[in-house]
Amino acid sequence: MNIEDLWDQFHQPLKTYISHRVNDQSIVDDLLQIVFMKIQVHLPNLIDEQKIDSWIYRITRNTIIDFYRTKKTSEILPDVLHFNDSAEEENFTKEATVCIRSTIKRLPEKYREALELTDFQGLSQKELSEKLGISYSGAKSRVQRGRGKLKQLLEGCCHIEADRYGNIVDFRILKE
């Protein structure tokens, strides 16, 4: 069986399968392309052509899982939170800045220091590793764990929405 025949036979059913699991149509199309690239690369290694249907759907399922896994890790917090300091700055941004800075103070020292140096003072994670005398991967882990802990604390006390660039677009302190 060649890739063109597989495309003719499977592209519509796979597109439907992916669409039931992913809402964004452009992502559906991207994932479908990735699936067929994987099929093309690994087709010569297929041992039992009788099981090609389940093989193709397994590739599709794993591709969707990989998509959500990478999406989840990239959504923890943006690399840097940006605060608009213009004269017409909205009140919630000021409140959010105060809330986030005070919440960061509740973090363990090593995470607090990592976030203050990277997110507020603008150091790169490489510069952070040099300043603290730790490995680069250690610095990356420390920043990521700090952001995770900060997110947990903030989710318990505040509602914060950020756009895809990390700009705060909505903020409210939750009633206790």
Swiss-Prot record:
Highest taxon of the lineage: Bacteria
Span of the annotated motif Polymerase core binding: 30-43
GO molecular-function term, one example from the UniProt record: DNA binding
GO biological process, one term: DNA-templated transcription initiation
The keyword Transmembrane belongs to this UniProt entry's keyword annotation: no
PROSITE patterns xref list: SIGMA70_ECF
Alphabetized UniProt keyword annotations: DNA-binding, Sigma factor, Transcription, Transcription regulation
DNA-binding region: 125-144
TM helices/strands, residue ranges: none
Function: Sigma factors are initiation factors that promote the attachment of RNA polymerase to specific initiation sites and are then released.
Record-stated family: Belongs to the sigma-70 factor family. ECF subfamily.
Designated name of the protein: RNA polymerase sigma factor SigZ
Organism the protein comes from: Bacillus subtilis (strain 168)
